Amino acid sequence: MDTKLLDILACPITKGPLKLSADKTELISKGAGLAYPIRDGIPVMLESEARTLTDEERLDK
């Protein structure tokens, strides 16, 4: 994932920042409690495609 792209992307729900997951397969929105998948290098920023974060993931800094 291009870091320049990550800098300009925002969560479509909260308009807050996104963080790249450790395995670089998801964009994490702590504010919305969602993880948006990255498929073939393209972030899928649809709420219907996002996964809900676990309680542990929500607390992880």
Swiss-Prot record:
InterPro entries referenced in this protein's UniProt entry, alphabetically: Trm112-like (IPR005651)
A matching Pfam family: Trm112p
Top-rank taxon, per record: Bacteria
GO cellular component, one term: cytosol
UniProt cross-references to PANTHER family, sorted A to Z: PROTEIN PREY, MITOCHONDRIAL (PTHR33505:SF4), ZGC:162634 (PTHR33505)
Family, as annotated: Belongs to the UPF0434 family.
Protein name: UPF0434 protein PSEEN1604
